[in-house]
């Protein structure tokens, strides 16, 4: 087969293409991500979680070298969505129901019960990124909670 016999050559050609077309590729990736975020609630959930953990590691000048699912302590992203679904509650003022379609800026957020901002070490972040430290919370409640630990 041509591919097997020319692995290095193919790799070089692909690398050269990526170098020559960085902006075009980045634009395509951004369009894809934006569209998929809108149409796939589980994808949006995974990106949100990954970003929060990545930022937490950055805040203590560490690099995130652990897979997000391993940090969560789960096998699949579907397990996380089921965990959140089991905790969904109606909006206290409007009665709106939590769904994966209203997850985000104006709907509900992923709240860390013990805030990531309390982490001082890599071990702290690993503990705080575990799924048992997460809960769905309406955006305005989460924004007013900020980095506090609430009594139950």
Each PLM stretch: what is its role?
Residues 144-152:
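Short metal-binding segments enriched for Cys and/or His
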